[in-house]
Amino acid sequence: CTNLELFKLKSNSDGALRQNKPLTVGYVGSIGVWYLFEEALDYYKLIQEVVPDAQLHIINKGGHTYINECLNNSGIDKGSVLLETRDHLDVAHAMQSMDVGIFMIKPLYSKIASMPTKLGEFLGCGVPCICNNGIGDMSDIINDRGVGVVLDSFDTDEKKESIMYLLKLIKDPLIKNRCRETALKYFSLEDGVNSYNNIYKSLDEKL
């Protein structure tokens, strides 16, 4: 579940400031054992081949040394990357200014039934997502609702094809509202609490 009172759409007045700004790809959170951070960087590099002035905004706590090593090895111009740490409230504000969120997760058995919190946070802010297949219901939600790109493999040709779709998706005037509606449908904290309460009540009645 996601706090959709915090992770919400940017106001129209703030949104007007986004005009004429470069495409911003956002990476928020861990780069640890479950995440394929280098695959995310590779995808960003391919985006830059199509949109040379695209920016990468990374928000992370505790992994900056490893991130900088990966950036150096990738050949990405660090002038196009903003790497920083923010508190929880500021993270939500920063995500509102991103055009697309990216995260790649190792499709391990332990992740089959999981759902990344950051998906709900990005969608709550009206930001479509790029991710890989094999993680919970994430692929079905993104594909069925048209709120991002799901990679079935890390093949370069598939990535390039998905980028063309992604760039069209970002220009869709309805995409932000569609992302927000998807977050409300699948990630509402209030609905999640109510669901758990109903489960506990039903268990109590059986005891």
Predicted regions and their residues:
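Conserved donor-binding loops in enzymes that form glycosidic bonds
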Residues: 1, 27-33, 60-61, 84-85, ...
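Short beta-strand->alpha-helix junction loop in the catalytic core
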Residues: 1-8
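Nucleotide-sugar donor-binding and catalytic loop/hinge architecture
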Residues: 8-24, 48-49
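Conserved donor-binding/catalytic core segment of Leloir-type glycosyltransferases
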Residues: 17-44, 57
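Nucleotide-activated donor-binding/catalytic signature segment of Leloir-type glycosyltransferases, i.e.
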Residues: 22, 60, 65-95, 100
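Nucleotide-sugar-dependent
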Residues: 35, 84-85, 89-94, 101-120, ...
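A charged, aromatic-enriched C-terminal amphipathic alpha-helix characteristic of glycosyltransferases
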Residues: 154-157, 170-202
